[in-house]
């Protein structure tokens, strides 16, 4: 009986300690205080499948930009405005980054990750990933998944 009590007490202390440590670590993330970001991605990679084999191409010609505002890391929300207008997104603050996830009813998933920089920095490294697939087959054409990843920087708004 004593061993069961010790085990329960140990588990409770471990869970409480993990919860406190987690809260403290994200509180120290400077991205927790940012309410808006302007992001620019000058480099991107496209993934394709040719004859069933994965292939990638890296390109630098296209400039892709987006704005993220109404960021609330406590409620886990934000708004991304890019080429298709404003979209409500899920925001997830971690120890070393801030993720924004956009999901559509058609199955598209876009994820933007902003990485922590030095204390006091206003510019942050960022990656924007797009994942889309609409299965379709018509004579002479079969659709393939559309995936890409953009690399660039985000600057904190004022």
Residue ranges and their predicted role:
Residues 95-140:
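Surface-exposed, polar helix/loop patches in the mature regions of secreted/periplasmic/lumenal proteins
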Residues 134-158:
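Edge beta-strand at a domain terminus
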Residues 71-112:
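Contiguous, well-ordered beta-strand patches that form the walls/edges
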Residues 33-77, 109-114:
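Short, solvent-exposed loop/hinge segments that bridge or flank secondary-structure elements
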Residues 23-33:
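Cleaved targeting-peptide boundary
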Residues 1-8:
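Bacterial N-terminal signal peptides that target proteins for export
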Residues 15-22:
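C-terminal segment of classical bacterial N-terminal signal peptides
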């Amino acid at each position: 009986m004593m061993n069961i009590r010790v085990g329960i007490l140990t588990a409770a202390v471990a869970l409480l300690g993990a919860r406190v440590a987690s809260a403290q670590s994200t509180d120290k993330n400077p991205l927790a205080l940012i309410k808006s970001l302007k992001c620019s991605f000058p480099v991107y990679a496209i993934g394709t499948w040719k004859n069933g084999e994965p292939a990638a191409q890296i390109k630098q010609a296209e400039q892709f930009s987006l704005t993220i505002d109404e960021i609330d890391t406590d409620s886990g929300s934000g708004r991304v405005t890019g080429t298709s207008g404003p979209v409500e997104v899920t925001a997830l603050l971690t120890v070393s980054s801030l993720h924004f996830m956009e999901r559509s009813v058609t199955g598209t998933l876009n994820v933007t990750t902003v990485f922590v920089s030095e204390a006091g920095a206003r510019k942050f490294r960022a990656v924007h990933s797009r994942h889309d697939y609409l299965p379709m087959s018509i004579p002479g054409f079969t659709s393939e998944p559309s995936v890409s990843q953009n690399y660039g920087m985000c600057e904190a708004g004022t």
